[in-house]
């Protein structure tokens, strides 16, 4: 068998993600663009989004964003509308939570828009289930 003479796999080629710390300029919508919130990921580079103009559209993630920008449900995205198809659109940009909050503050997003917060919601909002102890199970076990 031949010796491995390479310098690593595909993760080495990817390099370090240095864009995370970089603040980018806030991009507002232009003509032919709309803000939307992801409802459902469909796979194959497609998703279903509810636009803030009230229309539900099937969106295609363009090649520049594929495998680089991960989009999840309830993310705020900027989509480019198609002239020839009203019910389909292309994803141009994904806003992170801070950018979405500032868009809401500028009045670009409606007030009812839910932004996917990653903050902790404080005490009492745990996903724990509380059970009440109402049975006399101890007596039944002793009788056996």
Swiss-Prot record:
Biased composition (Acidic residues): 124-144
GO annotation terms (biological process): translational initiation
Residue ranges of the region described as Disordered: 1-26, 114-144
Lineage: superkingdom: Eukaryota
Main location: cytoplasm
Molecular function terms from GO: ribosomal large subunit binding; translation initiation factor activity; tRNA binding
Compositional bias per record (Basic residues), positions renumbered to this chain: 1-15
UniProt biased composition (Basic and acidic residues): 16-26
Cell location: Cytoplasm
Alphabetical UniProt keywords: Cytoplasm, Initiation factor, Protein biosynthesis, RNA-binding, tRNA-binding
Pfam families for this protein: eIF-1a
Domain S1-like: 22-96
PROSITE patterns assigned to the protein according to its UniProt record, in alphabetical order: IF1A, S1_IF1_TYPE
GO cellular component: cytoplasm
HAMAP family in alphabetical order: aIF_1A
Family: Belongs to the eIF-1A family.
Subunit record text: Component of the 43S pre-initiation complex (43S PIC), which is composed of the 40S ribosomal subunit, EIF1, eIF1A (EIF1AX), eIF3 complex, EIF5 and eIF2-GTP-initiator tRNA complex (eIF2 ternary complex). Interacts with EIF5; this interaction contributes to the maintenance of EIF1 within the open 43S PIC. Interacts through its C-terminal domain (CTD) with the CTD of EIF5B; from the location of the start codon by the 43S complex until the formation of the 80S complex.
Function: Component of the 43S pre-initiation complex (43S PIC), which binds to the mRNA cap-proximal region, scans mRNA 5'-untranslated region, and locates the initiation codon. This protein enhances formation of the cap-proximal complex. Together with EIF1, facilitates scanning, start codon recognition, promotion of the assembly of 48S complex at the initiation codon (43S PIC becomes 48S PIC after the start codon is reached), and dissociation of aberrant complexes.
Name recorded for this polypeptide: Eukaryotic translation initiation factor 1A
Species assigned in the record: Rattus norvegicus (Rat)
Lineage, broadest ranks: Eukaryota, Metazoa, Chordata, Craniata, Vertebrata
